[in-house]
């Protein structure tokens, strides 16, 4: 679940304290007792890369739309009243940064900045170097603990009490940092590289799936299809009626996330050239306002209704609440003139609107920093 910090400065102060305490106390009170100068140097290089990546993740602007931007013809025409400009695809207005953010992933309390198109590589490198450094450090700690245990009965004082104290404190702390950051890193990699989605887009997919299974999505998609592609359903009234009444349609047959090409292309889109992946100042070279889409999103007038729905821009419901159609039967019984009368009424299932919907992690749009008032 997304974390909200009461005092924003704490979001930066806590990581700075943990990096300094774990890294430098380990260096001076544990590692210097048994590592070579070369090994200590490499550890400090890795620790320095954490600081550089963290600094870039904090101060690099995540990216904002250029003035005068206009969406393409078959994209949603979303206008931000606060920035007074049209929002490109995948863009959201951050309430805390007070700007529209290109490919907004989330507002990170630990950097006091949004994670977006321009600084996502710095954020990922920050996580990577934390994992690399704490992983190496945990290896050294375990090695030293093993040495201490094997020589616990030695007459010579091979390990000082001071070193034992810091080993006891730093080992579980280092393991905790490694575990939590690894989980966050895996989540980011799964979303952005495997599925080609930001965390907000992954949340959006869950919300749309919820609408689908509550039978509020398909009528809205058909309405949007006629809006984006006028005349797309002309003369197909019978097919539309059969499509709505059919219960065999699956979620994947009508919903396509257009920015998921393949893991390699997804990786290049969010991290840039492989030569820049570990470059502390590297990043993608595109403008972050127009993106390549997969073949499934190509519109063809001659295809079926399902295939046409797959060509809708993201999100396919245009963030609308969805149109309800009969989904739950409510049977009422009454007696009239000595005869029992049965009435079957259809009651639409209530679904919270987008700005009030929560996923299974307990996250709403506000948890990601999105300004729901201008969405």
Curated annotation (Swiss-Prot):
GO biological process terms held by the UniProt record: protein targeting to membrane
The DHHC domain, residue ranges: 78-128
GO molecular function, a single term: protein-cysteine S-palmitoyltransferase activity
Membrane-topology annotation of the record: Multi-pass membrane protein
Topological domains, Cytoplasmic: 1-9, 55-121, 186-375
Catalytic activity: L-cysteinyl-[protein] + hexadecanoyl-CoA = S-hexadecanoyl-L-cysteinyl-[protein] + CoA
Places the protein is found: Endoplasmic reticulum membrane
Topological domains, Lumenal: 31-33, 143-164
Top EC class of this enzyme: transferase
Highest taxon, organism lineage: Eukaryota
Active site residues according to the UniProt entry: 108 (s-palmitoyl cysteine intermediate)
Domain text: The DHHC domain is required for palmitoyltransferase activity.
Family affiliation: Belongs to the DHHC palmitoyltransferase family. PFA4 subfamily.
Record-given protein name: Palmitoyltransferase PFA4
Species annotation: Eremothecium gossypii (strain ATCC 10895 / CBS 109.51 / FGSC 9923 / NRRL Y-1056)
């Amino acid at each position: 679940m997304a974390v909200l910090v009461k005092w924003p400065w704490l979001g930066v102060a806590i990581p700075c304290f943990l990096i300094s305490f774990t890294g430098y106390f380990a260096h001076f009170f544990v590692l210097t007792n048994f590592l070579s100068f070369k090994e200590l140097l490499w550890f400090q290089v890795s620790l320095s890369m954490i600081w550089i990546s963290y600094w870039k993740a904090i101060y690099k602007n995540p990216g904002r739309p250029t003035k005068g931007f206009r969406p393409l013809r078959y994209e949603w025409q979303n206008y931000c009243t606060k920035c007074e400009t049209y929002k490109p695809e995948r863009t959201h207005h951050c309430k805390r940064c007070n700007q529209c953010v290109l490919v907004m992933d989330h507002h990170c309390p630990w950097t006091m900045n949004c994670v977006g198109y321009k600084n996502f590589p710095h954020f990922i490198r920050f996580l990577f170097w934390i994992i690399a450094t704490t992983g190496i450090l945990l290896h050294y700690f375990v090695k030293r603990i093993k040495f201490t245990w094997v020589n616990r009965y030695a007459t010579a004082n091979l390990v000082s009490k001071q070193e034992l104290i810091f080993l006891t404190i730093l080992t579980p702390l280092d393991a905790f940092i490694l575990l939590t950051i690894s989980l966050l890193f895996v989540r980011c990699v799964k979303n952005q590289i495997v599925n080609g989605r930001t965390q907000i887009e992954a949340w959006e997919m869950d919300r749309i799936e919820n609408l689908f299974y509550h039978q509020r999505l398909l009528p809205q998609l058909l309405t949007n299809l006629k809006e984006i592609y006028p005349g797309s359903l002309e003369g197909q009234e019978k097919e539309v009626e059969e499509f709505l009444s059919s219960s065999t349609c699956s979620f994947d047959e009508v919903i396509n996330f257009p920015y998921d090409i393949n893991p390699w292309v997804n990786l290049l889109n969010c991290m840039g050239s492989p030569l820049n992946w570990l470059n502390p100042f590297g990043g993608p070279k595109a403008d972050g306002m127009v993106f390549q889409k997969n073949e499934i999103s190509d519109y063809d007038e001659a295809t079926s209704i399902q295939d046409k729905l797959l060509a809708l821009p993201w999100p396919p419901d245009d963030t609308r609440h969805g149109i309800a159609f009969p989904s739950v039967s409510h049977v009422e019984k009454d007696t009239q003139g000595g005869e029992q009368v049965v009435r079957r009424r259809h009651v639409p299932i209530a679904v919270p609107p987008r700005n009030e919907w929560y996923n299974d992690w307990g996250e709403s749009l506000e948890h990601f920093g999105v300004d729901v008032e201008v969405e």
